[in-house]
Amino acid sequence: MDAHAINERYVGPRCHRLAHVVLPRTFLLHHAIPLEPEIIFSTYTRFSRSPGSSRRLVVCGKRVLPGEENQLASSPSGLALSLPLFSHDGNFHPFDISVLRISCPGSNLSLTVRFLYLSLVVAMGAGRNNARSPTVDGVSPPEGAVAHPLEELQRLARATPDPALTRGPLQVLTGLLRAGSDGDRATHHMALEAPGTVRGESLDPPVSQKGPARTRHRPPPVRLSFNPVNADVPATWRDATNVYSGAPYYVCVYERGGRQEDDWLPIPLSFPEEPVPPPPGLVFMDDLFINTKQCDFVDTLEAACRTQGYTLRQRVPVAIPRDAEIADAVKSHFLEACLVLRGLASEASAWIRAATSPPLGRHACWMDVLGLWESRPHTLGLELRGVNCGGTDGDWLEILKQPDVQKTVSGSLVACVIVTPALEAWLVLPGGFAIKGRYRASKEDLVFIRGRYG
């Protein structure tokens, strides 16, 4: 596949091994990954034995359909790309995580998909051990079968030409299929000469009679050579399952070609003797950390609500009816928003964007739009440029100009969280009601967040 071959050439030398994957349509729909020309795919590895991560590498991703790029009908189709893998002293740690980040420069799109090293390495090893030759529709031609004449010509075109067949009709037809160099053309008639030469005469212009005669030398022809990218068909592919989402995908193994030969070497795995924390804690370390911070934030919201006598203030100036039904609806939205936040463990959240923002963007705010009662998917990590969320009336008027905030205030079944660079956050509910909380993060937490998610 083109994407795998390009990554093998340009990304392969910058990592220890490449895992070539194909993400099918079901995987793309599950993770809401769009297929647009402007999308940028970048990957890096989060190490389980240290809080840091590897350098970020941009990889090539391309959509592949059955029958395209010389693919077989039985080949996997979807989004083809590669995941760089990094080893420790020659061994791969099974609990390291390869992170695929999908972003689009012209929009706020920022998605991350995680792949566990253990799943990738096991699938690569299984594909290597059970490699099979690609066949058409899964059926291999019987031994001794007579090939089609055109297939025989193609085989001869790829083979080294036999001098005995240089003047034969079969070689003439073969030469038409092969892009040969000048002078590598078989002629049917032995008396024909190269074009541009007249028998007995030279086409060189006569030397001028004026002045001393000078010998004219033709400059040597310029030869340009390049190594084209060979888009081979995978020798085999294995099904794999994403540990974090349960969505299936494919891992491709190639038989030959450059560094792809390393796919056939043993893949060393280094399991810790007594991992601390246990393996589930290493695999879901990011989820546990983010979920802990989300629960702490919800605790600050509930504490602020108790301090205010279990009341909510209307921060955004909008007109709404004042009756018991509206009060019950706002209360229900507040309880549902707290439940959603406790279960939201995503590194694309606004508070992580705020914690990892560069110093030049400290005057911006970030927002998460939450779909309550599973009414809509969440939209996380939206940047509100030029907005200051200090809590004053003027700040709320500026915030109200944001389209997503307007939909939240005037709608239902939705809430939003606005986070400042200082990690102060406001939960905004329909009707303009808002309550202030805070994400607790120590200096060590900020170093961990910036090194792992920045």
From Swiss-Prot:
Name the GO terms of the biological process aspect.
chromosome organization
| Compartment(s) where it occurs, according to its Swiss-Prot or TrEMBL record | Virion; Host nucleus
Which one Pfam family would you cite for this protein?
Herpes_UL17
Query: What InterPro entries does the database record attribute to this sequence?
Result: UL17-like
The answer, when asked if Cytoplasm is one of the entry's keywords, is no
Residue numbers spanned by region Disordered: 197-227
Example GO CC term: the record gives: host cell nucleus
Top-rank taxon of the source lineage equals Viruses
Coarsely, its chief localization is virion
Instruction: Name the family.
Output: Belongs to the herpesviridae CVC1 protein family.
Q: Provide the assembly information.
A: Interacts (via C-terminus) with capsid vertex component 2/CVC2.
Q: What does this protein do?
A: Capsid vertex-specific component that plays a role during viral DNA encapsidation, assuring correct genome cleavage and presumably stabilizing capsids that contain full-length viral genomes.
Q: What is this protein called?
A: Capsid vertex component 1
- The species is Human herpesvirus 8 type P (isolate GK18)
